[in-house]
Amino acid sequence: SKSSNPNFKEGDLVRGFGEWADYANVDSDSFLVLEEGLDHEEAYLSALGLNGWTAYVGVMEVGKPKPGENFLVSAAAGATGSLAGQIAKKAGCRVIGLAGSKEKCDWLVDDLGFDVAINYKEENLDSALKKYCPEGIDIYFDNVAGDVLNTVMANLALNARIPLSGLLAQYNEKGARLPGPDNFDQLLMKRATITGFFCPDFLEDGPRIEALLSEWYKEGSLKFKADVTIGLENVLVAYKKIFTGENIGKTLVNWNSTSSGVAVGLILKSGTSAGGNTSITTCRIYDPSATVSNLIEAGVSN
């Protein structure tokens, strides 16, 4: 059936929040009509989606970078960290990424333009930070917390800023709370700040941020990688990758194992069903003539 919502016409490409399910009833006011024509429509769930918005806000509005500053990001090969490093580079920072494999480190330096990538599983992190940032870290975009944050806090520059985006170390503790930093005094001695920020804080500003990110993406200066798993039944397999470090870039699940189209998440295209003025109903119906299949985002929003 066609949508009777006046805000949407048949064939619109839209993005919004839904459920990991064949059918979902969602508020249509939360859906945005997207510009079509990108070479990779998965970008709307990564570089141009919440990951991109989070990276931009954390770097530019919380971190407030200055040219020449040392910018460090953890989980640097993840969906948000990889974008944060690129945005910091555009702001003139010297960018150092933390990742857990040679493959990830090579991608950060060779493809994304990071100045340095540290394999924290192979190198002593404290020694590496002192080697690559002898004058200290000015901005630390933290996606992890835990022991990594402790080590970084011992290597801060004066007036350092720590945008706190995620707590991956906490998520892996199965409900147990991690202890706080044991060198909390460094915040005082270095006049440093830790600022937590979360996507609901800037959702209303998303379209403005997305317009800026879109220009960078189209000119080729903002890149991403999608790690796509096939089949809704494998959503937990994909979800697990985020916490075990098996993914590189954005973790996505393509609902249709038979689809030949590009995957774009929680997206309605021709062939899906929409009805009512206050809600959109999504279903796993694939129109083989459509250029896009239904996709869902597998993982935390940032």
Give, region by region, the residue ranges found by the protein language model.
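Mid-domain Rossmann-like dinucleotide-binding core that forms the NAD(H)/NADP(H) cofactor-binding site
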Residues: 48-123
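A structural motif shared across PLP-dependent enzymes of the aminotransferase-like
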Residues: 17-31, 205
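Glycine-rich beta-strand-centered segment in the early N-terminal region that forms part
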Residues: 1-20
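Short amphipathic alpha-helix with an adjacent loop that forms part of the alpha/beta core around
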Residues: 124-134
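C-terminal capping/lid region of NAD(P)-dependent oxidoreductase domains
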Residues: 221-228, 236-260
